[in-house]
Amino acid sequence: MPPAELPPEERYKKAKEICFDLLAVRARTQEELRQALRRKGFDEETSETLLGKLDRAGLVNDAEFAELWVKSRHTTQGLSRTALMAELRRKGVDDEVAAQAAGEVDRESEEQMARELVRKRLGSLGNVDEQTALRRLLGFLARKGYPQGLAYTVIKEELREYGAESTLLDDAVID
């Protein structure tokens, strides 16, 4: 039966079950829950009432979600601050909250993660020429959201350390 046809108490109870089921899997933002309820056909009044209660009860907190999301995705996926902020925005986190959470990843840890990613990827590139390796590594770091200047610097140093005879980036001008 569509939620609109349920009595208000039943509609609220069903919406609450849906939210609790989603929250049992992982933390969610208010916007993620709002969209899930909208997809299931719940009216805005029921959704907003429930989300307000969940927020007041501390079960939904976008700032805490953003902080945990940044730590997890930076550590497990190696995402840069830029990519993390974009993900948080897509999940409905306020820009200011997203920026504050992504700011927890400092430049040094971002550079270290880029180095780890490049080292790991270098081992799996196989026997490719330096230009191909460079192109693939730059694309790889770009997809993770790393700034071009940082990517060039890290790849240049890691290729030297890895044993590349010459580095195509020696003469490159980095912005």
UniProtKB/Swiss-Prot annotation:
One of its GO terms (cellular component) is cytoplasm. Transmembrane segments: none annotated. It is found in: Cytoplasm. Keywords: Cytoplasm. InterPro entries: RecX_HTH_1st (IPR053926), RecX_HTH_2nd (IPR053924), RecX_HTH_3rd (IPR053925), Regulatory_RecX (IPR003783), WH-like_DNA-bd_sf (IPR036388). GO terms for biological process: regulation of DNA repair. Belongs to the RecX family. Modulates RecA activity. This is Regulatory protein RecX. It comes from Amycolatopsis mediterranei (strain U-32). The lineage of its organism: Bacteria, Bacillati, Actinomycetota, Actinomycetes, Pseudonocardiales. The gene is recX.
